């Protein structure tokens, strides 16, 4: 008699079930569907009050059969908390970060109740992927860019006066969306004029870091261990379209600074408790942590330069087998 497969929930980008490629998540779905009783649920489609999620099953050909709204129950739940691009107000949240925190609390509720046996990443760990978590770290110990939160624009003005400019970054965000480089008092005024008044962000949605030039480096983790790295030179930023020096290459042992960067990334990952995700550098400083929704590939235009999906799949399939 065949052993009963373990039930696994996998939260995915909602656009995946409508046909978007989403290669990292599709790789996971294909592999997990062979080894587990897999239920796919979509980020942004949680009914927080009723305690239900919108669920799907993978069908032949990579399509998805809707199962309706179900109560989460599984041996393992692999979560995805990167819905920063979704409209939080349409989901009943006045503040963007409240939408994020509701997801963290939702996962924790079902973990604590025993309805879900294990969550990757653990809810508290996903909570530490907010950039504001860096504000409580000793930047000298963890090689992070000093990070600040501000309760007023006057505090932002003070930060600009104290250095060579700052970067305002959404506390919960990615891909440079909503980021601003503030070099002067007039930059801060314009930034302030764009906040609130029914717009997408408020001051409390932002964190602030000193502007640091440098190459962008990423170290991917699966199971708490480094599985790949990449180095990006001369990429676009929210304030510059210049790509004269643009290049992407694997970042591996033997390259300049790799060993020191890896030690710093591993130290921060251990402190955070990160199981699946990535740690990003600008120059020689860590500027953010990415959680379980991280894309595990890097492309240069149409060419895949780094593909860390196999390592992610091995880890997640291994986690199922250990249940």
Positions of the model-derived regions?
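Conserved N-proximal alpha/beta basic substrate-recognition cap immediately N-terminal to
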Residues: 16-33, 39-147
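Extreme N-terminal starter segment of soluble prokaryotic enzymes
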Residues: 3-9
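Phosphate-binding site of ATP-dependent enzymes
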Residues: 175-271
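Structural motif
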Residues: 9, 78-80, 167
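Short glycine-rich anion-binding loops that position phosphate/pyrophosphate groups of nucleotides
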Residues: 82-85, 171-173, 292
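C-terminal active-site "lid" helix and adjoining low-complexity regulatory extension at the edge
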Residues: 3, 254-256, 270-274, 283-323
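A short glycine-rich, hydrophobically flanked beta-strand micro-motif that places a catalytic Asp/Glu
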Residues: 209, 217, 274-284
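Hydrophobic alpha-helical segments and helix pairs
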Residues: 124-176
């Amino acid at each position: 008699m065949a052993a009963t497969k373990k039930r696994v929930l996998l939260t995915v980008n909602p656009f995946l079930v409508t046909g978007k490629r989403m290669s990292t998540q599709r790789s996971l779905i294909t592999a997990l569907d062979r080894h587990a009783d897999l239920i796919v649920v979509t980020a942004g489609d949680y009914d927080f009050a009723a305690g239900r999620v919108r669920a799907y099953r993978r069908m032949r050909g990579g399509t998805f059969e809707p199962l309706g709204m179900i109560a989460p129950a599984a041996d393992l739940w692999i979560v995805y908390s990167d819905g920063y691009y979704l409209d939080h107000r349409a989901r009943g949240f006045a503040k963007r970060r409240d939408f994020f925190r509701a997801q963290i609390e939702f996962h924790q509720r079902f973990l604590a109740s025993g309805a879900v046996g294990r969550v990757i990443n653990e809810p508290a760990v996903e909570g530490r992927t907010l950039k504001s978590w860096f504000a409580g770290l000793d930047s000298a110990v963890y090689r992070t860019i000093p990070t600040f939160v501000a309760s007023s624009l006057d505090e932002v003005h003070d930060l600009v006066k104290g250095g060579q400019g700052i970067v305002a970054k959404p506390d919960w965000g990615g891909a440079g969306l909503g980021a601003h480089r503030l070099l002067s008092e007039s930059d801060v005024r314009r930034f302030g004029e764009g906040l609130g008044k029914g717009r997408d962000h408020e001051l409390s949605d932002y964190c602030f870091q000193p502007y640091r030039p440098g190459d962008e480096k990423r170290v991917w983790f699966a199971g708490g261990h480094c599985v790949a790295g990449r180095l990006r030179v001369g990429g676009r930023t929210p304030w510059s379209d210049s790509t004269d020096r643009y290049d992407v290459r694997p970042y591996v042992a033997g390259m300049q600074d790799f060993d020191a960067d890896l030690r710093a990334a591993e130290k921060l990952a251990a402190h955070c408790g990160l199981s699946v995700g990535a740690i990003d550098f600008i120059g020689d400083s860590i500027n953010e942590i990415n959680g379980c929704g991280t894309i595990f590939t890097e492309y240069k235009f149409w060419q895949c330069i780094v593909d860390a999906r196999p390592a992610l799949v091995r880890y997640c399939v291994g986690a199922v087998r250990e249940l």
